[in-house]
Amino acid sequence: MNRTIKHIFIHCTGGNQLAMPIDLMKEFAQKGWKKPGYHIVIDFMGRAHLMLPFEKVANGVKGWNLNAIHIAWIGGEDGKDSRTQEQADTMKVIVKLLKEKYPEAKLMGHRDIWGEDPKKWQKTCPNFNVREEF
């Protein structure tokens, strides 16, 4: 499938920071999803794991997935930005590479679909301000 990428979404998984990609795949299967919620996840050591090729549609943000790529750091169960330095560093490299490949794509945190007012957010994912960070 040839997709036009309009958005790059940054997420946290909202779970235990020590989880591994296989744990996430089990969670997605339990939800009845045929595909993962993210294209890439970053574990606590800063290792990036490809969960789904970019050519395929992930289940990251309902209603926004067709033209989006989803990147997540594993963790965030406390609702805070508890990324390790390794996760933050890897995220910066991935975002830089994706922005080079898809220069027209808008970079957003999951929560940004509800605007800038925290009172309107249905979740705090990715638990930090993507616009300020990147």
Report the location of each language-model feature.
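A short, structured beta-strand/loop element
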Residues: K56-N59, G63-L66
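Short, conserved "active-site rim" segments that organize catalytic pockets and cofactor/ligand binding
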Residues: M1-K56, P126
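Ligand-binding face of N-terminal immunoglobulin V-set domains in extracellular IgSF glycoproteins
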Residues: I71
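Short glycine-rich loop/turn motifs that provide flexible caps or phosphate-binding loops at active sites
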Residues: P36, K62, I74-G75, M108
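Basic/polar, cationic surfaces and motifs that engage anionic cell-wall
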Residues: M1-F9, T13, M45-A48, N67, ...
